[in-house]
Amino acid sequence: MVLGSLITACSNLSSGTNFSSLNQLRNSFSKNSELNQDKKELVTSLRDSFEVDSKSATNVLLDAWRFSLQDEKILEKQDPSRFVKAFGSGKSKEDVEPSTGVKGLRLVERYTQNVASIINNVIKLSSQTVTDFSFYYNSSRDFKVQIRLQATGTFDSAQAKSYLSQIGLSDSDIKDKNSISADLIFTYTPPSSNLFSKSSFDTLLRKINFNTNLRLQIIGKDELMQKLLQSNFVGQLADQNFQDQTIDLLPYVLYSIL
């Protein structure tokens, strides 16, 4: 189904519709040949569903997130046209949550821009695969989303030699090594404030803002990556917490129903 008459589809739904499953949400639009690019009515309908049954509605949103990453493999084999319709023009895998790029790893939040650039220049991402996506949601104060990614990349030894003293490695550590791999675990839990509520459905900006706390763990799968994660320079990548990380769930809803 392509992006077409979304307003018509949503206006045909009765006020207070309760979406209890992703399939139900998807089927609500299946009779329409197109969905309109204006997403306001979709956000409104999802907000109305949240008011009827917040637990069911939020589980549908989280399942759309899961479906986009785990089933549709949005990080691995994007449908470019569908991606633009869901996320908007100018967006990329860097804008998918989670991901193993500079933005997804919060490199700028962890380091200065200069240090983040050094890491990005030395380590180049080759592939990222979602290996598991599990979640439960009972209420805005009781939920957990855990996503596991497997990432592989190349290690630019020539670039790294310029930063060996900063990275904390020796020539022998990087000799004849040009590939690295790691498992990444993103765990999202309730924040202390700005809990998910009716006001999280922003009809003006066309967003569904899901605020969380994030724990990000990186586990090296090869000797070089393990040494990197043990170094003073990169060590804080291994396990760190981030407060108030807001995820817009609307693009994942759109990607799952288009």
UniProtKB/Swiss-Prot annotation:
Phenotype upon gene inactivation: Probably essential, it was not disrupted in a global transposon mutagenesis study.
Q: Name one Pfam family in it.
A: Lipoprotein_3
**UniProt family annotation:** Belongs to the MG439/MG440 family.
Q: What else is known?
A: Although suggested to be a lipoprotein it does not have a good signal sequence.
- Name the chain's protein: Uncharacterized protein MG440
Species per Swiss-Prot/TrEMBL record: Mycoplasma genitalium (strain ATCC 33530 / DSM 19775 / NCTC 10195 / G37)
Q: What lineage, starting at the top, does this entry show?
A: Bacteria, Bacillati, Mycoplasmatota, Mycoplasmoidales, Mycoplasmoidaceae
